[in-house]
Amino acid sequence: MRLSVSLLALAFGSLVAAAPNTKPRTCGSKPSMEFLAKSAEFAAKEASGELLNSLATIEVETYFHVVASGRTPSQGYLSDAMLANQLRVMNSDYGPHGIQFNLVRTTRTVNANWARDGDELGMKRALRQGGYNALNVYFLGDLGSLLGYCYFPTNASPGSTAFIRDGCVVVGQSVPGGNISNYNLGKTATHEVGHWFGGCFGSGDGVSDTPPQRSSTQGCPSSRDSCPGGGVDPIHNYMDYSYDVCMNQFTSGQRTRIYNMWNQYRARG
């Protein structure tokens, strides 16, 4: 699912020199029909108690890839401290649900074309590491009108295009210490990794304890109820599109869905 950010989107600029951008974000792409069918199947089984996750914890082999146009922060070259803070945010957000990200390796590449997402497949062929149970996060210097995007789990054989593309692409400016006002606390990575686990947006995720929404949340309202009768909107949920400071929760149903998706698609590697 791609996170669009320009008018309904957020233009990328310098980590240091650019003025903070405060435009809202929204999601511009849809999960595949295969994924939606599997989600509906899981929803039915979870509701009946037929399908329950069996793992107590998930440990995720994690690789960070910094892809910049040059060797300065303004060109997307993130420091070790910024990456450490991003990992800390991810573990803080997922840790209460028994999920831990173990950083195995960080790579840094200077390639102006890759840094602006000019050759996604070529970049990932060169940089991707680990099996299908390994999370690869690519921090790019310039995503144009995008804040980030990630691929939902599927039946991907090693070496296939789906296997190579797997992972999350995040604009480097969104990590803690970046300069995007309202979106620089590292929650973009948390949100995108949610898609990697199989989490979807609350308006149609099929999870029983996430109320339906007519549209994604923008900003950080005190309360919102876009679908009267279904419960107030989950504006604090990591899979919504609120400001970073507003995001602080997954539901127990989302945890169950993440574990079931993990068992289905990623646990075997």
Curated annotation (Swiss-Prot):
It is found in: Secreted. It is an enzyme of class 3 (hydrolase). Its main location: secreted. Gene3D superfamilies: Collagenase (Catalytic Domain). Transmembrane segments: none annotated. Residues 207-227 are annotated as: Disordered. The keyword Disulfide bond applies. Residues 210-225 have a biased composition (Polar residues). SUPFAM superfamilies: Metalloproteases ('zincins'), catalytic domain. The active site is at residue 192. The keyword Signal applies. One of its GO terms (molecular function) is metal ion binding. Zn(2+) binds at residues 191, 195. CDD domains: ZnMc_pappalysin_like. Residues 1-18 form the signal peptide. This is Extracellular metalloprotease UREG_07765. It comes from Uncinocarpus reesii (strain UAMH 1704).
